Amino acid sequence: MELTKQKTIDGVVQRDYALEVEGDTVPCVVWSREGAPPAPVLICMGHGGSQHKKTAGIRARALDYARRHGWVTLAIDAPGHGDRISRDQAATLAREVGARVRGVGGAQPFDAERMRAMLERSRRAIPEWKAALDATLALDCVGDDPAIGYWGVSMGTAIGVPFVASEPRIRCAVFGLAGLRPGAADFADAAKRIEIPVQFVFQWDDAVAPREHGIALFDAFGSKNKTMHINPGGHVEIPGFERDAWLAFYERHLG
């Protein structure tokens, strides 16, 4: 993993890396508290569709986790997102995703073609996440055998569920804003294999993930320690207090 850029933001070091995985360059970013001892906790954050590794919500929580708790956060650009595409491609993707989020008539439905595209993106992203995690664990800012958690909603869940199911080092996970659709047998199997603590956040009026699919995904998780938080509103209207719930969840399970 090659360091490409570094800056300090109010006591938090933000390091950009380039990681070669199976012939692709994966842009990564790691946040850690400046001058702190090696972190005992590492959070992996997966962004949503049309977003990127430094999207506002991820960056804000990564900075807060570093400042207040001394935790390290890792994020990567998913295939077809962030620094892996041009600005024009990113703008087109944002318009398409925005139309689906708003439930605009004529927005591309989640049909068989989109499901295949998502499965292919997840297939590519899983080894990338594993390689990024391996490389981050070797950094001086991360302690020996840290407690590792995952956070990812929407596309961060679509990729995160199969990733977490295949990654025994992760001790707990926050998912949400996604569902289990008919015919998604592999996704259902991955959810069933997740037996670590899970917190699942969902919006009751989500135009992207119908409520029956969200409930089906929550039910599919194999964990006996799982909680579903349902709030009114659309896909991008998660209440701010859920961020406090995520922090409390990590404190409870990662120490």
What name fits each language-model region?
Residues R181-P182, W204-A209, V236-E237:
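Acidic catalytic loop of the alpha/beta-hydrolase fold
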Residues M1-P38:
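N-terminal cap/lid segment of alpha/beta-hydrolase-fold proteins
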Residues P38-G48:
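Short beta-strand element of the alpha/beta-hydrolase
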Residues A216, S223-G255:
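C-terminal catalytic histidine-bearing segment of alpha/beta-hydrolase fold enzymes
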Residues I58-R59, F163, D186-F187, I196, ...:
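Short alpha-helix in the alpha/beta-hydrolase fold that links the catalytic acid
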Residues G48-C141, F187:
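Serine-hydrolase catalytic machinery in alpha/beta-hydrolase-like enzymes
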Residues P127-R193:
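Primarily recognizes the serine-hydrolase "nucleophile elbow" in alpha/beta-hydrolase
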Residues I194, F200-F202, D206:
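Short beta-strand/loop motif that positions the catalytic acidic residue
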